[in-house]
UniProtKB/Swiss-Prot annotation:
Its EC number is 3.1.21.-. Divalent metal cations. Has optimal activity with Mg(2+). The lineage of its organism: Eukaryota, Fungi, Dikarya, Ascomycota, Saccharomycotina. One of its GO terms (cellular component) is cytoplasm. A divalent metal cation 2 binds at E185, H226, H277. This is Deoxyribonuclease Tat-D. Belongs to the metallo-dependent hydrolases superfamily. TatD-type hydrolase family. GO terms for biological process: apoptotic DNA fragmentation; cellular response to oxidative stress. Has both endo- and exonuclease activities. Incises double-stranded DNA without obvious specificity via its endonuclease activity and excises the DNA from the 3'-to 5'-end by its exonuclease activity. May have a role in apoptosis. The keyword Nuclease applies. It is an enzyme of class 3 (hydrolase). Present with 1460 molecules/cell in log phase SD medium. InterPro entries: DNase_TatD-rel_CS, Metal_Hydrolase, TatD-like, TatD-type_Hydrolase.
Length: 418
């Protein structure tokens, strides 16, 4: 009954909406005895914006502790902090450790090099562009394309960086510290060659996948994957690792690192889970991924819900293979998105249970950090918006909201652990 009333836009029904929504948020899920819980699988907590820095300029002090408080007030229980480079992965490790006793959320992290950051495997002595980061692209496609030949002809620097990455993963893969939960964010991004070239992306996607197979400890970790406009190459690379293959060339001497692959044979563990996060592909792309393996799961956020075509694709994702995320501070749902129509239906009802957090411009936040109220920054996405993603997906798929939240929570915990 409440689902029907929530979709109504008739304000005369408001007196009925309040007790229904209040009951929904205070009750346990209809599908389980567990309370309402969200698990944000994509939180870029090391991003400069959460430390008050926008385009290289400091506007306010770091506010990520307040951000976590807001998330907890909106039923976010767990979050996966993403690493996009070796340095950022190290920062994620340190940040998760430093806020462990302060955070109302359980925070975990990934380790990996994003396709837009693979230039870091090129010799930094070749110039600042070689060490360009996710926040500072080279903006030079010709330069990016030149790096591949240099790296292959003189692989020693890349060998050292891959060993550094492998060592970092091994150091964190320890039974007494379970904050390291996934290898990633790794993959292919053919929309942003101004960050890195296709060939550099492909070779270091494969090398990182090889690293993930080098020993029994790492082979058990799920993969956190990125794919933009690259489905065919992405699937082809993953197919090789699912089937198993021998790398006789060993250009980067990975066989010296792990005893399990001293023969140069690489194959995913049959139970390994693969999460393609922030999915924005076509219906054809989706089917290729789902058909590749029953262990592939699809993560959706605001970027996955921009257009009517996006919504039609999300509708086709099996609920049991669906995960939710914000990819904060990016990928918010905007008024111009096709998905916003579904949020508008809920806004008045939602405000009965709890009003939306107020937001201010980034240059005004410093004055609000000591206030009792928790202020957001306009235009900056946060984990507290997980509910928005869930609402849109439940509407598009015509799945009961409580059931969707419960199912995605359980699926996420099976992959990354609770």
């Amino acid at each position: 009954m409440w689902g029907i009333l929530l979709k109504s836009s008739n304000k005369s029904c408001s007196r009925l909406w309040k007790p229904i929504l209040t009951q929904y948020y205070s009750m346990t899920s209809t599908a389980t005895d567990s309370p309402l819980k969200y698990y944000d699988i994509g939180l870029n907590l090391t991003d400069p914006m959460f430390h008050g820095i926008y385009n290289g300029k400091q506007y306010h002090p770091a506010d990520y502790v307040k951000l976590l408080e807001r998330a907890a007030q909106r039923h976010v229980k767990n979050a996966l902090v993403t690493g996009s480079s070796i340095a950022e992965s190290q920062s994620a490790i340190e940040l998760v450790s430093s806020v462990k006793d302060l955070s109302p959320l359980k925070l975990y992290h990934t380790i990996g090099v994003h396709p837009c950051c693979v230039n870091e495997f090129a010799d930094a002595s070749q110039g600042d562009k070689a060490s360009a980061s996710i926040d500072n692209p080279s903006m030079d496609e010709a330069y990016n394309e030149s790096l591949y030949a240099k790296v292959i002809s003189n692989p020693s620097f890349a060998q050292g960086k891959l060993k550094e990455l492998y060592d970092l993963m091994n150091q964190q893969a320890k039974p007494h510290d379970t904050s390291f939960r996934s290898i990633g964010e790794i993959g292919l991004d053919y929309d942003r060659f101004h960050y890195s070239s296709k060939e550099m992306q492909k070779v270091f996607f494969e090398e990182q996948l090889k690293i993930s197979c080098l020993n029994d400890k790492l082979s058990s970790y799920p993969l956190f994957l990125h794919m933009r406009s690259a489905c065919d190459d992405f699937v082809q690379i993953l197919e090789r690792f699912i089937a198993g293959f021998t790398d006789e060339r060993d250009t980067f001497q990975l066989q010296k690192l792990g005893a399990s692959s001293s023969s140069g044979f690489y194959k995913f563990h049959p139970d390994r889970k693969l999460v393609v996060h922030s999915f924005t592909g076509s219906a054809i792309d989706l089917q290729k991924l789902l058909n590749l393996s029953p262990n592939i799961f699809i993560g959706v956020n605001g970027c996955s819900l921009r257009t009517e075509e996006n919504l039609a694709v999300v509708k086709q994702i099996p609920t049991e293979r669906l995960l939710l995320e914000t990819d904060a501070p990016w990928c918010e749902i905007k008024r111009t998105h096709a998905s916003f129509q579904y949020l508008a239906k809920y806004q008045e009802v939602r405000d009965f249970e709890y009003p939306a957090f107020k937001s201010v411009k980034k240059n005004k936040l410093a004055d609000k950090l000591n206030a009792e109220e928790l202020y957001m920054v306009k235009g900056r996405n946060e984990p507290c918006n997980m509910e928005q993603v869930a609402i849109v997906v439940s509407e598009v798929k015509d799945v009961d909201l409580a059931t969707l939240i419960d199912t995605t929570w359980k699926t996420t915990c099976k992959i990354f652990g609770e």
